[in-house]
Amino acid sequence: MTRVALPDSFLRLPITHRALHHRAAGRIENSPQAIRAAVAAGYGIEVDLQLSADGVPMVFHDEVLDRLTGEAGPVNTRTAAELGRIRLTGSTDTIPTLAEALALIAGRVPLLIEIKDQSLTMGPTDGRLEAATAEGLNGYQGDVALMSFNPASVAHMARLAPQLPRGITTSAYDPDDWAPMPEPMCAHFRAIPDYDATLSSFISHEAPDL
């Protein structure tokens, strides 16, 4: 396993966080309309992945549906077909799959994928989302990079897709913001101890902390 350099396209272009969303215009974060808008503007795109109940990577930030839809409860208790019928609040869009997002982007702009922590504790990963992501990216023609707050996910992706650049999403890990994560664990992750172990090539850090 080797460290893979981040393509220049990720540094030349602005990267739209959760795509180019604008709620007043009906473009909700991580939605097809937000993805199309970012591509049209020539901007790179960052999206988040959660796993459906039937093992499909879904482009959605939260682990629960409540904030962005009229539904409630965990994303991972619904199938991809069920999630694909749930409308995003304030939009005509529904929750897209990774495959649908890739088809919209079609290699025209760089894509940064954050794999959301499925353990919810920054603990070991069962590897299901990582495996589904690697499979979904197989054969995709375009610049892609992967990242996660959870170093276990980054390490897993390094084994499954060693050809793709990977990074660690980091934070100040204020215990008040990361409860119930214990303070010693916050201090551990604050030091970014897994950067070299995962052969990461970049860090994505929360802007307010810089």
Pin down the residues of each PLM region.
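Phosphate-group recognition and catalysis centered on beta-loop-alpha active-site segments
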Residues: 1-210
